[in-house]
Swiss-Prot record:
NCBIfam families attached to this UniProt entry: ispE, PRK14608.1
UniProt keyword list: ATP-binding, Isoprene biosynthesis, Kinase, Nucleotide-binding, Transferase
Chain's role: Catalyzes the phosphorylation of the position 2 hydroxy group of 4-diphosphocytidyl-2C-methyl-D-erythritol.
Residues reported in the UniProt entry to bind ATP: P99, M100, G101, A102, G103, L104, G105, G106, G107, S108, S109
Gene field: ispE
Protein's UniProt name: 4-diphosphocytidyl-2-C-methyl-D-erythritol kinase
The organism of origin for this protein: Paraburkholderia phytofirmans (strain DSM 17436 / LMG 22146 / PsJN)
Pathway(s) where this gene product acts: Isoprenoid biosynthesis; isopentenyl diphosphate biosynthesis via DXP pathway; isopentenyl diphosphate from 1-deoxy-D-xylulose 5-phosphate: step 3/6
GO MF term set: 4-(cytidine 5'-diphospho)-2-C-methyl-D-erythritol kinase activity; ATP binding
Length: 293
């Protein structure tokens, strides 16, 4: 990251994985309650912020099918400006790497990085919990990225506790298909009654079991997505002879954990050439973590 008086450049908006995802119920308002472990990755979009004196919030990067007014970065900046009454403006540039509809949290992470970066650039000094409350207005996953540590999440994803996860390298494969989260949540076949866990149920296994992630829990959305999207099923079948794998979030990305980068890259080399993939390391903390207290 490069910081000047008027800009913050090369700000990573890290991807996330759901190491497991259990849906434990459905609230009267229609939102689902869940339990998951969020794992940060050292891979994601890169954002650049330049302060504007005219108070305008703009996005100078063209993104297909995402007009600026619908972009979560612009919405995050607008929300923060309204909340604080700041006279400042900003221009946002985005180097987009994470695919949309992939279960990697790309848009949510972009929004959180925007909140953290502008907290610094605009000299707002809002505490982390206040930023997390704002983040929840932008989406269920956004508070986690502001929280900035690997976490056990409950509720709709906003109740967060830090978890210590072993260092890993991951091979992430994303089929060329967009999976709409809302549509999967509305499926009648979706399991909504997984038995709630406690945070003490899994830390020891996470740190010592070589078969993680297959050894603990599951993704309750995976079976539904596999039934609707043959591309996701195909990737999971490919992994059966390579390493234990599962889907992240509502898909479409599928991941497997490896002890070393070399092992992950060796598996990646065997992939069909037409599949999108990345090898990435785990991350313990959001790169902009210190921009809130």
């Amino acid at each position: 990251m490069i910081e000047t008086t008027d800009s913050l450049r090369d700000c990573l908006a890290p991807a996330k994985l759901n190491l497991f995802l259990h849906i434990t119920g459905r609230r009267p308002d229609g939102y689902h309650t869940l339990q998951t472990v969020f794992q940060l990755l050292d891979w994601g979009d890169t954002l650049h912020f330049t302060r504007r004196d005219d108070g305008l919030i703009t996005r100078s990067t063209e993104i297909a099918d995402v007009p600026p007014e619908h972009d979560l970065t612009v919405r995050a900046a607008t929300l923060l400006k309204a909340h604080t009454g700041s006279p400042e403006g900003v221009d946002i540039e985005i180097d987009k790497r994470l695919p949309m509809g992939a279960g990697l949290g790309g848009g949510s992470s972009d929004a959180a990085t925007t909140l953290l970066a502008l907290n610094r650039l605009w000299k707002l000094n809002l505490p982390r919990l206040e930023l997390q409350a704002l983040a929840l207005k932008l989406g269920a996953d956004v508070p986690f990225f502001v929280f900035g540590k690997n976490a056990f999440a409950q509720g709709v994803g906003e109740a967060l506790d830090v978890v210590q996860l072993p260092p890993r390298h991951f091979l992430v494969v994303t089929p060329r298909v967009h999976v709409p989260t809302a549509a999967i949540f509305s499926e009648k076949a979706l399991t909504r009654d997984s038995k709630p866990l406690t945070i003490t149920d899994f830390p020891a296994e996470l740190s010592c079991n070589t078969e993680w992630p297959e050894s603990f829990g599951r993704n309750d959305m995976q079976q539904v997505v596999v039934g609707k999207y043959a591309e996701v099923a195909q990737v999971l079948r490919w992994f059966e002879n390579v390493a234990p794998a599962r889907m992240s979030g509502s898909g479409a990305s599928v991941f497997a954990a490896f002890r070393s980068k070399a092992e992950a890259e060796a598996a990646q080399a065997k992939l069909p050439a037409e599949w999108n993939s990345a090898v990435t390391a785990s991350l313990d903390q959001h790169p902009l973590f210190t921009f809130a207290s």
